[in-house]
Protein backbone atom coordinates (compact mmCIF):
# COMPACT_ATOMS: atom_id res chain seq x y z
CA UNK A 1 0.00 0.00 0.00
CA UNK A 2 1.49 3.37 -1.01
CA UNK A 3 2.06 6.04 1.62
CA UNK A 4 -0.52 8.81 1.82
CA UNK A 5 0.73 12.37 1.81
CA UNK A 6 -2.28 13.73 3.69
CA UNK A 7 -1.41 11.51 6.65
CA UNK A 8 2.27 12.44 6.48
CA UNK A 9 3.15 8.80 5.87
CA UNK A 10 6.72 7.68 5.20
CA UNK A 11 7.38 3.99 5.79
CA UNK A 12 10.55 3.31 7.76
CA UNK A 13 12.23 0.41 5.99
CA UNK A 14 15.75 0.39 7.43
CA UNK A 15 16.19 -2.78 9.48
CA UNK A 16 19.13 -1.21 11.31
CA UNK A 17 17.11 1.85 12.39
CA UNK A 18 14.17 -0.29 13.45
CA UNK A 19 16.53 -2.31 15.62
CA UNK A 20 17.98 0.88 17.13
CA UNK A 21 14.49 2.11 18.03
CA UNK A 22 13.60 -1.14 19.80
CA UNK A 23 16.94 -1.20 21.62
CA UNK A 24 16.46 2.39 22.81
CA UNK A 25 13.11 1.46 24.34
CA UNK A 26 14.88 -1.03 26.65
CA UNK A 27 11.87 -3.31 26.56
CA UNK A 28 11.11 -5.90 29.22
CA UNK A 29 8.76 -8.86 28.68
CA UNK A 30 6.37 -7.40 31.26
CA UNK A 31 6.16 -4.00 29.54
CA UNK A 32 2.99 -2.53 28.07
CA UNK A 33 3.73 -0.24 25.14
CA UNK A 34 1.80 2.40 23.19
CA UNK A 35 2.66 2.62 19.49
CA UNK A 36 1.38 5.66 17.61
CA UNK A 37 0.94 5.23 13.87
CA UNK A 38 1.98 1.59 13.33
CA UNK A 39 1.62 2.00 9.56
CA UNK A 40 2.31 -1.29 7.82
CA UNK A 41 3.64 -2.92 10.97
CA UNK A 42 7.41 -3.08 10.56
CA UNK A 43 8.01 -1.77 14.07
CA UNK A 44 4.86 -3.41 15.42
CA UNK A 45 6.21 -6.86 14.61
CA UNK A 46 9.36 -6.23 16.63
CA UNK A 47 7.46 -4.79 19.58
CA UNK A 48 5.01 -7.69 19.75
CA UNK A 49 7.89 -10.12 19.96
CA UNK A 50 9.33 -8.28 22.96
CA UNK A 51 6.46 -7.23 25.26
CA UNK A 52 3.39 -8.57 27.02
CA UNK A 53 0.99 -5.94 25.72
CA UNK A 54 1.06 -3.55 22.74
CA UNK A 55 -1.59 -0.89 22.10
CA UNK A 56 -1.38 0.48 18.56
CA UNK A 57 -3.34 3.58 17.51
CA UNK A 58 -3.81 4.04 13.76
CA UNK A 59 -5.79 6.74 11.93
CA UNK A 60 -5.70 5.35 8.39
CA UNK A 61 -8.73 3.06 8.01
CA UNK A 62 -7.18 1.18 5.09
CA UNK A 63 -4.22 0.22 7.26
CA UNK A 64 -6.48 -0.94 10.09
CA UNK A 65 -7.61 -3.93 8.03
CA UNK A 66 -4.07 -4.87 7.09
CA UNK A 67 -2.83 -4.62 10.66
CA UNK A 68 -5.77 -6.60 12.00
CA UNK A 69 -5.22 -9.32 9.43
CA UNK A 70 -1.51 -9.48 10.16
CA UNK A 71 -1.49 -9.24 13.95
CA UNK A 72 -5.10 -9.65 15.05
CA UNK A 73 -4.58 -13.20 16.32
CA UNK A 74 -1.81 -12.14 18.71
CA UNK A 75 -3.09 -12.10 22.29
CA UNK A 76 -0.74 -9.26 23.21
CA UNK A 77 -1.99 -6.94 20.43
CA UNK A 78 -4.69 -4.28 20.81
CA UNK A 79 -5.48 -2.11 17.79
CA UNK A 80 -7.42 1.14 18.17
CA UNK A 81 -8.68 3.21 15.26
CA UNK A 82 -8.59 6.97 15.55
CA UNK A 83 -6.63 10.19 15.85
CA UNK A 84 -4.23 9.99 18.80
CA UNK A 85 -5.01 13.64 19.59
CA UNK A 86 -8.76 13.06 19.79
CA UNK A 87 -9.18 9.43 20.76
CA UNK A 88 -9.60 8.66 24.46
CA UNK A 89 -7.36 5.63 24.19
CA UNK A 90 -6.84 5.39 27.95
CA UNK A 91 -10.58 4.84 28.45
CA UNK A 92 -10.68 2.33 25.59
CA UNK A 93 -8.23 0.03 27.36
CA UNK A 94 -9.03 0.86 30.99
CA UNK A 95 -10.85 -2.44 31.57
CA UNK A 96 -8.23 -4.55 29.80
CA UNK A 97 -5.46 -5.22 32.36
CA UNK A 98 -3.05 -6.58 29.79
CA UNK A 99 -2.98 -3.25 27.96
CA UNK A 100 -4.01 -0.60 30.50
CA UNK A 101 -1.51 2.03 31.66
CA UNK A 102 1.31 1.48 29.16
CA UNK A 103 4.65 2.54 30.58
CA UNK A 104 6.45 3.23 27.31
CA UNK A 105 5.74 4.91 23.99
CA UNK A 106 7.40 3.98 20.71
CA UNK A 107 6.37 5.91 17.63
CA UNK A 108 7.21 7.17 14.17
CA UNK A 109 4.93 10.17 14.50
CA UNK A 110 3.71 12.46 11.70
CA UNK A 111 6.06 15.42 11.64
CA UNK A 112 3.28 17.96 11.12
CA UNK A 113 1.72 17.20 14.53
CA UNK A 114 4.84 16.51 16.60
CA UNK A 115 4.17 19.41 19.00
CA UNK A 116 0.59 18.48 19.89
CA UNK A 117 1.54 14.81 20.28
CA UNK A 118 4.38 15.71 22.64
CA UNK A 119 2.01 17.80 24.73
CA UNK A 120 -0.53 14.97 24.89
CA UNK A 121 2.16 12.51 26.01
CA UNK A 122 4.08 14.75 28.45
CA UNK A 123 1.47 17.28 29.49
CA UNK A 124 2.50 20.87 30.18
CA UNK A 125 4.54 22.61 32.85
CA UNK A 126 1.30 23.63 34.53
CA UNK A 127 -0.31 20.19 34.12
CA UNK A 128 2.21 17.35 33.72
CA UNK A 129 0.79 14.03 32.59
CA UNK A 130 0.18 11.67 35.50
CA UNK A 131 1.08 8.91 35.70
CA UNK A 132 4.08 9.76 33.55
CA UNK A 133 5.44 7.34 30.99
CA UNK A 134 8.74 5.72 31.86
CA UNK A 135 10.27 6.27 28.43
CA UNK A 136 9.30 7.61 25.00
CA UNK A 137 11.27 6.68 21.89
CA UNK A 138 10.17 8.87 19.00
CA UNK A 139 11.22 9.35 15.40
CA UNK A 140 11.00 13.07 14.67
CA UNK A 141 12.27 15.66 12.22
CA UNK A 142 15.92 16.52 12.89
CA UNK A 143 15.10 20.21 13.35
CA UNK A 144 12.63 19.33 16.10
CA UNK A 145 15.13 16.96 17.73
CA UNK A 146 17.68 19.79 17.76
CA UNK A 147 15.21 22.04 19.57
CA UNK A 148 14.13 19.39 22.05
CA UNK A 149 17.67 18.38 23.01
CA UNK A 150 19.33 21.81 22.84
CA UNK A 151 21.20 23.22 25.81
CA UNK A 152 21.41 26.88 26.95
CA UNK A 153 23.37 29.02 24.52
CA UNK A 154 22.81 26.80 21.50
CA UNK A 155 21.04 28.30 18.50
CA UNK A 156 18.17 25.79 18.67
CA UNK A 157 17.49 26.40 22.38
CA UNK A 158 14.13 28.03 22.93
CA UNK A 159 10.85 27.90 24.82
CA UNK A 160 10.11 24.39 23.50
CA UNK A 161 13.47 23.19 24.85
CA UNK A 162 12.71 24.53 28.32
CA UNK A 163 9.13 23.24 28.38
CA UNK A 164 10.06 19.70 27.35
CA UNK A 165 13.23 19.47 29.44
CA UNK A 166 11.34 20.71 32.49
CA UNK A 167 9.23 17.58 32.14
CA UNK A 168 11.73 15.08 30.73
CA UNK A 169 15.35 14.47 29.86
CA UNK A 170 16.01 14.26 26.12
CA UNK A 171 18.80 12.54 24.21
CA UNK A 172 19.47 11.67 20.59
CA UNK A 173 19.59 7.97 19.72
CA UNK A 174 20.59 8.08 16.06
CA UNK A 175 20.29 10.06 12.85
CA UNK A 176 17.93 8.72 10.18
CA UNK A 177 18.67 9.74 6.57
CA UNK A 178 15.83 10.12 4.04
CA UNK A 179 16.87 6.94 2.21
CA UNK A 180 15.73 4.96 5.27
CA UNK A 181 12.10 5.66 4.29
CA UNK A 182 9.75 4.92 1.45
CA UNK A 183 9.02 7.40 0.04
CA UNK A 184 12.03 9.43 1.24
CA UNK A 185 11.01 12.61 3.10
CA UNK A 186 12.55 15.93 2.14
CA UNK A 187 14.00 16.42 5.62
CA UNK A 188 16.51 14.69 7.86
CA UNK A 189 15.15 12.70 10.80
CA UNK A 190 16.37 11.69 14.25
CA UNK A 191 15.36 9.09 16.82
CA UNK A 192 15.16 10.62 20.31
CA UNK A 193 14.57 9.17 23.76
CA UNK A 194 12.58 11.14 26.33
CA UNK A 195 12.57 10.07 29.97
CA UNK A 196 9.83 11.91 31.89
CA UNK A 197 10.86 13.06 35.34
CA UNK A 198 8.82 11.35 38.10
CA UNK A 199 8.47 14.78 39.68
CA UNK A 200 9.46 17.78 37.53
CA UNK A 201 11.70 20.47 38.94
CA UNK A 202 10.09 22.33 41.81
CA UNK A 203 8.37 25.52 40.73
CA UNK A 204 6.03 27.30 43.12
CA UNK A 205 3.80 28.48 40.28
CA UNK A 206 4.00 26.42 37.05
CA UNK A 207 1.33 28.53 35.36
CA UNK A 208 3.37 31.67 35.96
CA UNK A 209 6.45 29.93 34.55
CA UNK A 210 4.55 29.18 31.32
CA UNK A 211 3.67 32.88 30.98
CA UNK A 212 7.21 33.94 31.81
CA UNK A 213 8.60 31.69 29.06
CA UNK A 214 6.10 33.05 26.54
CA UNK A 215 7.15 36.61 27.31
CA UNK A 216 10.85 35.85 27.69
CA UNK A 217 11.14 34.17 24.29
CA UNK A 218 8.74 36.57 22.54
CA UNK A 219 11.66 38.34 20.83
CA UNK A 220 14.81 36.20 20.94
CA UNK A 221 17.03 38.93 19.50
CA UNK A 222 16.22 41.27 22.36
CA UNK A 223 17.81 41.16 25.77
CA UNK A 224 15.64 39.26 28.22
CA UNK A 225 15.23 42.23 30.55
CA UNK A 226 13.64 44.21 27.71
CA UNK A 227 11.20 41.39 26.98
CA UNK A 228 10.16 41.32 30.63
CA UNK A 229 9.68 45.06 31.11
CA UNK A 230 6.04 44.84 30.11
CA UNK A 231 5.46 42.63 33.16
CA UNK A 232 7.91 43.81 35.82
CA UNK A 233 9.74 46.93 36.91
CA UNK A 234 13.43 47.39 36.14
CA UNK A 235 14.20 47.09 39.85
CA UNK A 236 12.45 43.72 40.11
CA UNK A 237 14.23 42.40 37.05
CA UNK A 238 17.68 43.58 38.16
CA UNK A 239 17.26 42.06 41.62
CA UNK A 240 16.11 38.71 40.25
CA UNK A 241 18.92 38.63 37.67
CA UNK A 242 21.52 39.30 40.35
CA UNK A 243 20.10 36.60 42.62
CA UNK A 244 20.49 33.94 39.92
CA UNK A 245 23.76 35.03 38.31
CA UNK A 246 22.11 36.23 35.11
CA UNK A 247 24.06 38.86 33.18
CA UNK A 248 22.18 42.14 32.55
CA UNK A 249 22.60 41.67 28.78
CA UNK A 250 21.49 38.01 28.81
CA UNK A 251 19.04 36.73 26.22
CA UNK A 252 16.36 34.15 26.91
CA UNK A 253 18.22 31.34 25.13
CA UNK A 254 21.16 31.54 27.55
CA UNK A 255 19.24 30.71 30.74
CA UNK A 256 19.19 27.25 32.28
CA UNK A 257 15.96 25.68 33.47
CA UNK A 258 17.00 26.30 37.08
CA UNK A 259 17.47 29.99 36.31
CA UNK A 260 14.02 30.19 34.73
CA UNK A 261 12.53 28.59 37.82
CA UNK A 262 14.45 31.02 40.02
CA UNK A 263 13.16 34.01 38.05
CA UNK A 264 9.62 32.69 38.28
CA UNK A 265 9.91 32.39 42.06
CA UNK A 266 11.59 35.75 42.68
CA UNK A 267 9.62 37.90 40.25
CA UNK A 268 6.23 36.73 41.45
CA UNK A 269 2.99 37.65 39.72
CA UNK A 270 3.13 40.70 37.46
CA UNK A 271 0.89 43.53 38.63
CA UNK A 272 0.04 46.92 37.22
CA UNK A 273 1.60 48.60 40.22
CA UNK A 274 4.90 46.84 39.58
CA UNK A 275 5.29 48.24 36.09
CA UNK A 276 7.65 51.15 35.68
CA UNK A 277 6.36 52.94 32.57
CA UNK A 278 9.50 55.04 32.28
CA UNK A 279 11.91 52.07 32.34
Swiss-Prot record:
Q: Does the keyword Transcription apply?
A: no
Q: Which GO terms describe its cellular component?
A: cytosol
Q: Which EC main class describes this enzyme?
A: transferase
Cellular location(s): Cytoplasm
Alphabetized, the UniProt keywords read: Cytoplasm, Methyltransferase, RNA-binding, rRNA processing, S-adenosyl-L-methionine, Transferase
Q: Which PROSITE patterns match?
A: RRNA_A_DIMETH, SAM_RNA_A_N6_MT
**What biological function has been recorded for the protein in this entry?**
Specifically dimethylates two adjacent adenosines (A1518 and A1519) in the loop of a conserved hairpin near the 3'-end of 16S rRNA in the 30S particle. May play a critical role in biogenesis of 30S subunits.
Protein name (database record): Ribosomal RNA small subunit methyltransferase A
Q: Which species?
A: Synechococcus elongatus (strain ATCC 33912 / PCC 7942 / FACHB-805) (Anacystis nidulans R2)
Amino acid sequence: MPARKRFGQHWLRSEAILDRIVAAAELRPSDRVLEIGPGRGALTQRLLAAVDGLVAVELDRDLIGQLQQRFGQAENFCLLEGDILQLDWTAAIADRPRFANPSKVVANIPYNITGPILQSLLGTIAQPRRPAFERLVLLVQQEVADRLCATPGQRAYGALSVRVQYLASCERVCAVPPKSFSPPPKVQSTVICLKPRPWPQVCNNPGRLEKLLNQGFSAKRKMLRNNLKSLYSSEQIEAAFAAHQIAPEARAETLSIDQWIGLCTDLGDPTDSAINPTA
